[in-house]
A protein has these predicted regions:
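A short, N-terminal "cap"/entry segment at the start of jelly-roll beta-barrel domains
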Residues: 1-54
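Conserved hydrophobic/aromatic beta-strand scaffold that supports enzyme active sites
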Residues: 44-46, 57-59, 78, 100-102, ...
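Short, charged/polar surface micro-motifs in flexible loops or helix N-caps
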Residues: 52-54, 63-66, 85, 107-108
């Protein structure tokens, strides 16, 4: 995707100067190659990054029993569970395939793939803003 440089703040208001390209990410969920190590037993595949807001979209994969450290989101988070079971230690629900979650900005939590998950968990996360 080309980078467009503007001479002034109002240049970007001209619809003819805006980028209209689409971006398509092939996540290849069953391929071992494109996964980035994140924590013990946890990997992610980046789908896109918003360099303006710090937001990002990723597919997270975790083995049963794997856990991320407690973390904090400065913006909202949406998650959709495609495979496996997972939860936050700070809540009493368990996400299973088909579960959609919404997190308000400012929540701190600890993600855990449940020990009894029948397979590695695959979750699509769309994060607005940074992760601390």
């Amino acid at each position: 995707m080309p980078i467009i440089a503007f001479n002034s703040a109002t240049d970007g208001l001209d619809p003819s100067r805006r980028s209209r390209g689409h971006f398509v990410a092939d996540t290849r969920l069953d391929d071992d190659g494109p996964w980035v190590p994140y924590a013990e037993g946890v990997w992610f595949q980046p789908c896109c990054f918003n360099v303006t807001s710090g937001g990002f979209s990723v597919v997270l994969k975790g083995l049963p029993g794997a856990q991320l450290g407690v973390h904090y989101h400065v913006g909202t988070v949406r998650g959709y569970t495609m495979r496996g079971h997972w939860r936050y230690l700070e809540h009493d629900w368990v996400a299973k395939p088909g579960t959609f979650i919404y997190e308000p900005a400012g929540e701190a939590h600890t993600l855990v793939i449940t020990d009894d998950s029948p397979e590695p968990a695959l979750i699509l996360f769309i994060v607005e803003g940074g992760l601390i």
